[in-house]
Amino acid sequence: MATAKTWKIAREIGDAVIKASRNPNRRWYGPHMAAAVRAISERIPLVDFVLEIRDARIPLSSEYELLRKFSPLPSKRIIVLNKMELADPLELKKCIDYFEERNYLSYAVNSHNKDCVKQLLNFLQSQVRELHKAGHSGHTTTMMLLGIPNVGKSALSNSLHHIGRISAAEKGKLKHTTVSSQPGDTKDIMSLKIGSHPNVYVLDTPGIFPPNLYDAEICAKLALTGAIPDDIVGELKLARLFLTILNSSHEYKKWAKLCKSQDLTESLSDESSKSDAKHKRQYATDHTQDFIVYDVRRVLYETISAFDGNLEDEISMGNLIETQFAALRSVLRVPEEASEFADLRVASKILNLYRTGRLGHYTLEHVSALAKSYTYL
């Protein structure tokens, strides 16, 4: 969110989210969320650890505000930065270093990577051992996973449960919590065993937002990363925000090799079309196929590199984005139709590629912002 243009787009999106949060019929803070707040508040004093799951791309905006009500926190707190595979590695390291310098326990994880989850499990087990050395007398250790919607609590709970049970060579039916790309699917608190000798359980909880949201920039980041339902703002606006961030960054320069030689590009295209024509015909509309993703990266690189306008200027940035949408219709195999509907299809596909890490790694806020906001920890 570094440039003035990005902020203008973010402000429009953020204001829409704030307006929705004040709507009496708002969807993300329904009766189930109010009930979850009560249930979680009652259990926090009873658990041994609180694992606050945050989105590594927005370590500030994905803060779990409910924890501010507990000062000091009765349980040992660990900040887990999930979705590390989607964040800028350098910025992520700065964030981890920031927490460590201030003696805050933190850990970065990719909940879909088995080795990464194993390392987190080992870290958690070491914390359990430290707890027992300090005089914890119980035979069971409990860890409550807390966080806003769609930061990956359920995916992480499942991974810890599966790997923990396998590591302990335990038999029996594995449990599963509901995992979805849509925020708000988890409605109840669920207990999953992740270790034995001593027994260790994680409690997966529903994602919780405050009843009202007030900061437009934070709301825009939450919307872009998928913590808030897309239809509140619209995928078209969100995709434009992402393209603004991409166009203002250096991430696209990593794709230069895709365009080093036009002859090479054409040769690869011809070879691909000959050797894999049947494959392409079958999956031509699947934008997640590698050959389509490469084409998307190439088009984005070419359009940004060829642009000679001022990216700090709102009108110029808008013109570049319009050029990119027009070029992307072809590589994303969007049928010829009314421009508005075609752009909606392009936006949906681009947004998905961004959120799955196919279009680079982005951290939307930096350590300087953390330093201003986390004195209460």
From Swiss-Prot:
GO MF term list = GTP binding; hydrolase activity
> For GTP, which residues are the binding ones?
N82, K83, M84, E85, N110, S111, N150, V151, G152, K153, S154, A155, G207
- State where the transit peptide lies: 1-21
> Residue ranges for motif DARXP motif?
55-59
Provide a GO CC annotation, any one. mitochondrion
List keywords of the entry alphabetically.
GTP-binding, Hydrolase, Mitochondrion, Nucleotide-binding, Transit peptide
Residue ranges of every copy of the CP-type G domain listed in the record:
34-211
Supply the InterPro entries for this chain. G_CP_dom (IPR030378), GTP-bd (IPR006073), P-loop_NTPase (IPR027417)
The entry's localization annotation reads: Mitochondrion
Which CDD domains does the UniProt record give? YlqF
Q: Which family does it belong to?
A: Belongs to the TRAFAC class YlqF/YawG GTPase family. MTG1 subfamily.
Q: What is known of its domains?
A: In contrast to other GTP-binding proteins, this family is characterized by a circular permutation of the GTPase motifs described by a G4-G1-G3 pattern.
As for what it does, the entry says: GTPase that may function in mitochondrial ribosome assembly.
Q: What is the name attached to this protein's record? A: DAR GTPase 2, mitochondrial
